[in-house]
Amino acid sequence: MPSDLTKLDALPLHSRTPMEWARAVLADPVRLLMDHAFLEKKAATNALELLTRWPGDGLPGWVETMTGVARDETAHLAQVTRILLRRGGRLDRIHKNPYANSLRLLVRKGDPAEILDRLLVSAAIEVRSCERFAVLAAASADAELAAFYEALFASEFGHYRVFLELARKMADPAAVESRWQQLLASEAEILARQEAGPRIHSGCLLPPLHSGGPRSGG
């Protein structure tokens, strides 16, 4: 499993997750996997909800794209639950994700702004998940988990790009980029406020990325 994290330099995040976070959450792999399973379930549900929010003929292939994302996320859910159950874990009936919930509160009401924000928030969650999976893969001494999280990086990166490119087709590129940077800044602030614990989007001391300013992700 490659430990080179230079691929993360291309991500547009406004903060970077330290390796110490990964080492801490990997100390309780069963609870981490449980949280991850719910993350994949919500990601699949989000894609299915967006499927019926097709914004019109200007975005052909919308339904096919969203069904593809939902299919991928459901496959990830199956993978993570298999690992979880094999290790003696189970899925709780109730699960809270204050990180994602806080991001979704930033979505403006009323289309087209609402659907644009939903795409950008989805992209922000995917790109942070992408980063976290890469850090987990690099930090894990568990060969199965390291390989699992390394393999997820490419898929989550693809989903992030899908959501971002769809958003860029919905409105003036400059307006989309401005909103994207606003949401990325908010994402970093929201993540920094999260409590520590064995969760994919748990909090830690996140160093800001100062060199060169925020990246556009494009």
What are these regions (language model features)?
Residues M1-G218:
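Non-heme di-metal
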